[in-house]
Amino acid sequence: MSQFDSLIIGEVAQDTNVDYDGTTVHAVGGAVYYSGFAAANTGHKTAVLPKADTAQVDLAAAFSPAPNVTVYPLHSRTSFVTKNVYHTPDRERRTSTVDSVIEPYRTEEVPDIDAAIWHLAGLAAGDIPNEMIPFAARHAMVAIDVQTMLRWVENGGMVYHDWAEKKELLPYVRFLKTDAAEAEILTGFTDRAEAARQLYQWGAKEILITHNT
């Protein structure tokens, strides 16, 4: 049996969130942060490998309220710093600006952690390089939040581009999480069932597509 159920890899974000009504909140965020809390609160033994400028962000303290989480902090000379302006109450439409990003993860800085699932939960393309996927697959089942392959920081903003290496790398992926818009970028299909079938044919074993109805 593995020491941990999940190892979640990704940078934390220093977020400024402006709601549609003008309410402004400064917070720690990011996929690793929210996924870490969610996994821990299901009872999973969870390890997280967050990355940030540790002079600015206390990574252990950020996760301290979560049960069952072991933190392996990594230092970057820069952090992921962003501002999100939400235009609708459901937060589906937003404008994001990015002040800085982390130094990319490197395979050689990943500790020897025994986990059943390695969940790659970055925030922008390049933060978790493509070579991390086959590396992770040699250690565990691989889960990916595909935003880390589609969202690019350009001119201080976030734009989406297709994942050029998707057909090469999806066969390494056991669990693929995408939203409906990201699934359309990947496959060209607006129909979620068709998109899921295409992603499965390209090699992902289990696909979760989130959406608002």
Mark where each language-model region is.
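Flexible, glycine/proline-enriched loop segments at strand-loop-helix junctions
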Residues: 115-124, 148-158
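Active-site metal-binding loops of divalent metal-dependent hydrolases
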Residues: 10-12, 31
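Structural detector of well-ordered beta-strand residues that form the stable sheet scaffold
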Residues: 142-145, 208
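Short beta-strand/turn micro-motifs composed of small residues
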Residues: 10, 50-52, 146, 211
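Conserved phosphate/ATP/ADP-binding segment of small-molecule kinases
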Residues: 152-213
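Short amphipathic alpha-helical segments and helix-helix/interface helices
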Residues: 36, 60-61, 107-110, 129-134, ...
